[in-house]
């Protein structure tokens, strides 16, 4: 762009025009054509507000103009890295897709360039920019946000091409430099079908749109802004140094869906290409010129772009280890210095006078280098770059100023030099910088890459400050705090794209948060938990610095609230917009400026007051809170409201809010040039994950696009609103200026934009919860209220309501999967829906575990719907009043409602859903499919439709009535109770239909031989085959009622006249198996009875102590199985007699066993003791005797005849004798035939109970088992100097000599007696005993049996003996 040198008055337009120095002669005749290189701006005639006379892009009028703006600023849908972006026209038609490359990052282009258009310079190195050579007029430029201003201090012009590079005064920390293509000026390198698959550009200046008819309309930029778009493949000329594209035809698909034609006003703006080989975007050119058909760019080559940075370096400083430190001396007057190590000296150059560009860069190589400043250094624009590890210190408090520090990847620099007040140390590079100076560092820090560790040390007075302020930007850097005193937290700010503040286990308190965008991150990765306190406060006048700017004749940009001085009128103005027009044209526009008079002090006070008022508005934090920390938010000054529209990731941390309001919300998508609004439709979803949110007399809102995972604990009148419409937006969002919060209301229009909560909410002491949008979790409410208006609420955890209300508002939908427990009633309002189910299986699709719910009532209003299905069990009355409510019990979906839970039979009785309670609703509709309804009291329904279900009237204590206007029943069972004179009643008043329904009757006392009790009454003419008598098992019998049909003038009745019973073999067998469980326990003890004596024959010794542990499993028919653990401890003594060794001893025993079968399950604990003796004759014969007593504590749960769980005690005793003979085949091997007899006693047991009103009893008497065993063992001994091992195997036959007692069963059909059965089995054992040294014995044995009704499946026992 041309530099403006003077303004000339035009008599035709009667206004000033800006004239370039390149115009040889400029007149203002309307017919005179201006030179291509002359750019004129007529402010009055064209009503332009831009500060430069520039023409820029012409784009399609068919596509929303905002898309081109968003594209250029990486806003809206054009976030860097986004793929497959669809472009639509104004009518919503798809124009095309950006699918050849991920979205480029344009942040390296300037966002402002002083009085020049934005985008005409591009950062390609941390301190260097490139533009067109003919572009001039401003030395200041900004990156990321407008306030991040840098000054160009040096230029390198290309002698033959329209391109130049410029050096900045500091390293840029806000953005990453663009990468430059390594192809460079090669003819044909950028043509179609080559390595580069996509071309994007951006720029600023005057803008136009053109429709398909060729009509062009100007877009007024009001200070200038960026637009961008797609460019076709490029052709080369001038030996590849120039590239061109036919961009003039913006409707040619070859130019891409966002084609744009550029004019001279956009000179210097960048052109990017996607390198498909290296998978990255690279800078390939800057705009130079244009024709009527297209545009021309100068190719950016690495050779030329590298010239200026190379020329700005002094000689490389190569540190040599072992030759001492580098002594750095500097002469500020001459701007020169030296670095000396031993006999080697390197010259350096710093700021000379006011010339920052005189300062040269220094590159330090070598490793473990040391530099000591002998003098304070002002290096001007020169920066320090470290390619190795270094330590830089000051001899005696010397300071350093310059362009900044670059630490290369993998390097670590220990920086022990303080800075200067008013200057910031700029740090880039992927390496680490540890700040380790002493005392108070008055300088600031701006970090854009790598890691900075703040570890400043206290001075003699205990004062410490690593920096006066810390700015974190670009999204790349991390700042680590070694302690909490390094920097005032209020002076930490996060700029463009932010970065990480690593707390490192330290605690911080913020009274203000300066976070420009979502890139701001406060994190703690230390194992030591940090606490962050957000004690946000209103600004104080003393904290506010008000710089006074000068109104520029060329217009400019600023931040709303900035103070300006107009020298021509000597008045002060406060800027209300983000930019202002040139030539003072809008100085009287009250929407742009606020006139605050001529008094400087009063003007400053006005600005301060406005900033104070703004800071008292609700607070907002756009950034992130991550890691191992807790966050505390006390009562805040001002309006005590904090809105978080960033994110929270504290999986093991909590956030605590005391009073006031806390809001978690999504974030409105930022669009270029527009202010975010609560009413806009596009929002970004934000995630808030934490262990717990604690509210104390506070209000919490989870608003649109907020997704929260974590528990909430609300107490002392707190309010929780999940799905709130209350949101806050930031008027400064996307500008980098101070947050200016604006309250609004926003309701999601799609389910995906609704708030989404997952967790458990606990309410206490008059707190309240409103569920208005997506909810998944549980609730515990104590003396509180809960309302649900959401149509997508799921309780997948328990819902518990103690002295608390649960209300489903109009149209709400709630599904409870883990049960609802309420001491009060649940209200379901008009058109609302409440569904109770079991817990879905995480492993099996369509499977559920049964879940019980209980309330004091379910109240249904008009058109409300209530369902229990998929293993849901509800104990509650349902009240529908006179409303047309719908009640659904069960589910017809064959693929859902399955279960493999043992509760399916015991609790659910094999049905999909269970209701225990009455239904009252004369106009209600009840639908039952595969459901069970225990209807007690008086129930009433308008219509009842039942399929494959069961309805049990009454509870066996009080008679119940079910009255239905219309009953349709198929394959359904109805169960009623009678006392022989009265019975439960089913009354159908209007219509009866259906078939294959059975009626069962439970008798509350012994049935009479003759009776006549009405069970069912239906309208006259009803089909008498609708109901038939059914048979059910009660006790140990099958009972069938005798039902006759009576027809009267107005009704058809089903009348009970008697009953028939037959014995049920299955129930009797289940009872017999249950009673026989004691025998199996006896048998387990028998198998363990004589183990000790067998050990004595293998390992003889003297007096000693021993211990044994045995674990085994057994099984029998009837699906019986058991497992047991048996422990014995004992002591015995050897008595040496003539021809015989007699062992006598005592033992204590404990057995823990569990058993189950199709009839019952249970557990037994047995404890006892005994005495034994074993005689081992020298001839090889032996004789063993043992007696033992056991006490048993038993708990069994039966699943037959409603026996339930029984706890009882029993006892048994055992007397055993065994005789055998050990024949030695050799000295080491032997054969041992055996015979054993065990006699015992097992105590009897008796049970009495009722099943469906029928009295039952079950008992067996004490009985005396007699068990014999014969067998043979073989064995062999192996020995060494101090050890001996005896291995053996055995085969035996065990048999009952007496039957195992008698079982007596009694029910209404009479007495049934069952004699015990005998059993026998083959026993197989293998084992070994080991003698270790002289006093230790170890043994191990495996046992199994076969061919018995009861068998030992596997048993293993181990024993240990210590000989005295």
Curated annotation (Swiss-Prot):
GO BP of this protein: proteolysis
Please state how the activity of this protein is regulated: Inhibited by the serine protease inhibitor PMSF, but not by benzamidine, alpha 1-antitrypsin, alpha 1-antichymotrypsin. Not inhibited by metalloprotease inhibitors such as EDTA and orthophenanthroline.
- Which EC numbers does the record give? 3.4.21.-
Q: Where is the signal peptide?
A: 1-56
Temperature sensitivity?
A: Optimum temperature is 37 degrees Celsius.
The record's top EC class is: hydrolase
| PROSITE patterns reported for this sequence | AUTOTRANSPORTER (PS51208), PEPTIDASE_S6 (PS51691)
GO MF annotations, alphabetized: serine-type endopeptidase activity
Q: Does the keyword Signal apply?
A: yes
User: Active site at which residues?
Assistant: 134, 162, 267
What residues correspond to the site Cleavage? 1089-1090
Which residues are in the Autotransporter domain?
Answer: 1098-1364
Q: How would you describe the post-translational modification of this protein? A: Cleaved to release the mature protein from the outer membrane. Cleavage is performed by an unknown protease.
Q: Which Gene3D superfamilies would you find in this protein's record? A: 2.160.20.20, 2.40.10.120, Autotransporter beta-domain
Q: List the InterPro entries hit by this protein, alphabetically.
A: Autotransporte_beta, Autotransporte_beta_dom_sf, Autotransporter_pectin_lyase_C, Bact_Autotransporter_VF, OM_autotransptr_brl_dom, Pectin_lyase_fold/virulence, Peptidase_S1_PA, Peptidase_S6
Outcome after substituting residue 600 to H: In plasmid pWR100 and plasmid pWR501
Which Pfam family, any one, appears in the UniProt record? Peptidase_S6
Q: Where is the Peptidase S6 domain?
A: 57-307
State the UniProt keywords alphabetically: Cell outer membrane, Hydrolase, Membrane, Periplasm, Plasmid, Protease, Secreted, Serine protease, Signal, Transmembrane, Transmembrane beta strand, Virulence, Zymogen
Free-text disruption phenotype from the record: Mutants exhibit an attenuated virulence in the rabbit ligated ileal loop model.
User: What are the annotated GO cellular component locations?
Assistant: cell outer membrane; cell surface; extracellular region; periplasmic space
Q: What else is known?
A: Secretion across inner membrane is dependent on the SecA and SecYEG apparatus. However, intracellular polar localization precedes secretion and is independent of SecA.
Please state what the annotation says regarding this protein's domains. The signal peptide, cleaved at the inner membrane, guides the autotransporter protein to the periplasmic space. Then, insertion of the C-terminal translocator domain in the outer membrane forms a hydrophilic pore for the translocation of the passenger domain to the bacterial cell surface, with subsequent cleavage.
Record function comment: Major protein secreted in laboratory media showing proteolytic activity. May be involved in invasion and destruction of host intestinal epithelium.
Q: What is this protein called?
A: Serine protease SepA autotransporter
Annotated source species: Shigella flexneri
Q: Which gene encodes it?
A: sepA
């Amino acid at each position: 762009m041309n530099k403006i040198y003077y303004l000339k008055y035009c008599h035709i337009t009667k206004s000033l025009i800006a004239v370039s120095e390149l115009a040889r002669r400029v007149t203002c005749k309307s017919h005179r054509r201006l030179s291509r290189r002359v750019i004129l701006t007529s402010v009055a005639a064209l009503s332009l507000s831009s500060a430069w006379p520039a023409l820029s892009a012409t784009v399609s009028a068919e596509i929303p103009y905002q898309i081109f703006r968003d594209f250029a600023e990486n806003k809206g849908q054009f976030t860097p890295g986004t793929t497959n972006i669809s472009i639509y026209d104004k009518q919503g038609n798809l124009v095309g897709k950006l699918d050849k490359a991920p979205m480029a990052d344009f942040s390296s282009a300037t966002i402002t360039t002083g009085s020049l258009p934005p985008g005409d310079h591009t950062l390609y190195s941390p301190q260097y920019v490139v533009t067109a050579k003919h572009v001039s007029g401003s030395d200041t430029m900004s990156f990321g946000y407008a306030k991040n201003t840098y000054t160009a201090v040096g230029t390198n012009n290309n002698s033959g091409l329209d391109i130049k590079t410029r050096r900045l005064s500091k390293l840029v920390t806000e953005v990453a430099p663009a990468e430059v293509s390594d192809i460079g000026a090669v003819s044909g390198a950028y043509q179609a079908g080559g390595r580069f698959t996509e071309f994007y550009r951006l720029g600023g200046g005057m803008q136009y749109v053109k429709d398909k008819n060729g009509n062009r309309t100007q877009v007024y930029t009001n200070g200038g802004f960026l637009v961008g778009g797609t460019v076709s493949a490029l052709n080369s000329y001038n030996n590849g140094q120039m590239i061109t594209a036919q961009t003039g035809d913006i409707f040619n698909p070859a130019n891409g869906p966002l084609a744009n034609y550029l004019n001279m006003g956009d000179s210097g703006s960048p052109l990017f290409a996607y390198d498909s080989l290296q998978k990255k975007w690279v800078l390939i050119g800057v705009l130079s010129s244009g024709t009527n058909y297209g545009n021309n760019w100068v190719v950016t080559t690495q050779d030329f772009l590298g010239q200026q940075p190379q020329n700005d370096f002094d000689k490389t400083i190569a540190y040599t280890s072992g030759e001492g430190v580098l002594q750095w001396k500097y002469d500020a007057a001459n701007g020169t210095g030296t670095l000396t190590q031993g006999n080697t000296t390197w010259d350096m150059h710093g700021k000379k006078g006011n010339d920052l560009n005189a300062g040269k860069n220094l590159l330090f190589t070598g490793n473990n280098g040391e530099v000591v400043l002998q003098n304070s250094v002002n290096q001007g624009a020169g920066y320090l770059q470290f390619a190795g590890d270094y330590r830089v210190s000051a001899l005696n408090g010397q300071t350093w100023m310059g362009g900044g520090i670059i630490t290369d990847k993998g390097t670590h620099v220990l920086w022990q030099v303080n800075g200067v007040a008013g200057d910031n140390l700029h740090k880039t590079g992927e390496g680490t910088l540890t700040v380790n100076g002493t005392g108070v560092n008055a300088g600031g820090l701006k970090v854009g890459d790598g890691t900075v560790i703040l570890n400043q040390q206290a001075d003699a007075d205990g004062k410490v400050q690593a920096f006066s302020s810390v700015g974190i930007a670009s999204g790349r850097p991390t700042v680590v705090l070694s302690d909490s005193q390094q920097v005032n937290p209020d002076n930490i700010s996060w700029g463009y794209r932010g970065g990480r503040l690593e707390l490192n286990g330290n605690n911080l308190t913020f009274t203000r948060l300066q976070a420009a965008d979502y890139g701001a991150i406060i994190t703690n990765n230390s194992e030591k938990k940090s606490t962050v306190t957000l004690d946000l406060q209103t600004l104080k006048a003393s904290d506010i610095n008000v710089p006074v700017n000068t109104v520029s004749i060329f217009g400019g940009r600023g931040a709303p609230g900035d103070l300006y001085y107009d020298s021509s009128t000597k008045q002060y103005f406060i800027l209300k917009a983000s930019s202002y027009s040139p030539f003072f044209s809008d100085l009287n526009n009250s929407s742009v400026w606020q006139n605050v008079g001529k008094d400087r002090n009063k003007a400053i006070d006005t600005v301060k007051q406005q900033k104070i008022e703004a800071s008292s508005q609700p607070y907002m934090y756009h950034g992130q809170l991550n890691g191992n920390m807790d966050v505390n938010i006390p009562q805040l000054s001002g309006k005590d409201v904090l809105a978080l529209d960033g994110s929270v990731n504290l999986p093991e941390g909590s956030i605590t809010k005391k009073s006031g309001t806390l809001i978690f919300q999504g974030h409105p998508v930022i669009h270029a040039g527009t202010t975010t609004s609560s009413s806009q439709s596009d929002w970004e979803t934000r995630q808030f994950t934490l262990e717990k949110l604690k509210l104390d007399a506070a209000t919490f809102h989870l608003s649109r696009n907020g997704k929260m995972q974590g528990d909430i604990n609300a107490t002392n009148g707190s309010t929780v609103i999940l799905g709130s419409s209350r949101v806050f937006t930031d008027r400064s969002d996307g500008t980098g200026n101070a947050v200016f919060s604006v309250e609004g209301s926003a309701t999601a229009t799609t389910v995906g934009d609704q708030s989404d909560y997952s967790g458990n909410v606990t309410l206490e002491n008059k707190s309240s919860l409103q569920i208005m949008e997506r909810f998944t979790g549980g609730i515990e409410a104590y003396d509180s209220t809960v309302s649900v208006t959401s149509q997508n609420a799921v309780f997948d955890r328990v819902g518990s309501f103690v002295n608390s209300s649960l209300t489903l508002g109009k149209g709400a939908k709630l599904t409870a999967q883990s049960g609802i427990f309420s001491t009060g009633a649940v209200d379901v309002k008009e058109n609302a829906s409440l569904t109770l189910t079991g817990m879905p299986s995480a492993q099996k699709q369509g499977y559920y575990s049964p879940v019980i719910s209980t309330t004091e009532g379910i109240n249904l209003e008009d058109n409300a719907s209530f369902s229990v299905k998929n293993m849901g069990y509800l104990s509650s009355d349902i009240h529908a009043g006179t409303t047309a409510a719908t009640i659904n019990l069960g589910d017809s979906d064959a693929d859902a409602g399955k279960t493999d839970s043992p509760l399916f039979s015991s609790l659910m009785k094999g049905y999909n859903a269970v209701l225990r309670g009455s239904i009252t609703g004369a106009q209600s509709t009840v639908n039952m499919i595969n459901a069970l309804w225990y209807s007690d009291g008086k129930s009433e329904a308008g219509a009842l439709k039942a399929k494959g279900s069961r309805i049990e009237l009454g509870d066996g204590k009080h008679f119940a009535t079910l009255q239905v206007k219309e009953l349709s029943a198929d394959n359904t069972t109805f169960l009623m109770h009678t006392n022989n004179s009265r019975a439960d009643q089913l009354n159908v008043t209007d219509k009866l239909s259906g078939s294959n329904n059975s009626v069962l009757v439970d008798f509350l006392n012994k049935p009479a031989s003759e009776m006549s009790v009405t069970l069912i009454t239906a309208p006259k003419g009803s089909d008498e085959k609708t109901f038939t008598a059914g048979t059910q098992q009660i006790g140990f019998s099958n009972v069938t009622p005798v039902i006759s049909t009576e027809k009267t003038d107005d009704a058809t009745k089903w009348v009970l006249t008697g009953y028939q019973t037959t014995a049920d073999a299955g129930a009797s067998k289940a009872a017999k198996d249950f009673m026989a469980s004691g025998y199996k326990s006896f048998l387990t003890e028998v198998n363990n009875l004589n183990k000790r004596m067998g050990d004595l024959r293998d390992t003889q010794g003297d007096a000693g102590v021993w211990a044994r542990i045995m674990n085994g499993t057994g099984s029998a028919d009837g699906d019986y199985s058991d497992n047991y653990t048996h422990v014995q401890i004992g002591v015995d003594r050897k008595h040496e007699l003539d021809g015989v060794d007699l062992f006598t001893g005592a033992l204590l025993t404990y057995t823990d066993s569990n058993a189950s079968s199709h009839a019952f399950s249970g557990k037994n604990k047995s404890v006892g003791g005994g005495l034994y003796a074993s005689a081992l004759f020298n001839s090889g014969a032996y004789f063993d005797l043992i007696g033992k007593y056991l006490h048993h504590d038993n708990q069994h749960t039966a699943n037959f005849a409603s026996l339930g769980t029984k706890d009882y005690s029993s006892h048994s005793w055992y007397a055993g004798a065994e005789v055998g003979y050990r024949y030695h085949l050799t000295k080491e091997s032997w054969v041992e035939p055996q015979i054993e007899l065990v006699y015992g006693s097992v105590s009897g047991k008796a049970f009495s109970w009722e099943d469906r009103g029928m009295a039952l009893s079950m008992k067996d008497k004490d009985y005396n088992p007699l068990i014999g065993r014969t067998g043979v063992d073989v064995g062999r001994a192996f020995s060494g100097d101090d050890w001996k091992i005896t291995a053996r195997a055995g085969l035996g036959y065990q048999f009952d000599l007496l039957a195992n007692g008698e079982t007596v069963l009694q029910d209404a059909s009479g007495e049934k007696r069952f004699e015990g059965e005998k059993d026998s089995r083959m026993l197989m054992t293998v084992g070994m005993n080991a003698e270790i040294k002289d006093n230790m014995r170890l043994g191990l044995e495996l046992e199994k049996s076969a061919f018995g009704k009861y068998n030992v499946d596997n048993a293993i026992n181990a024993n240990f003996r210590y000989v005295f």
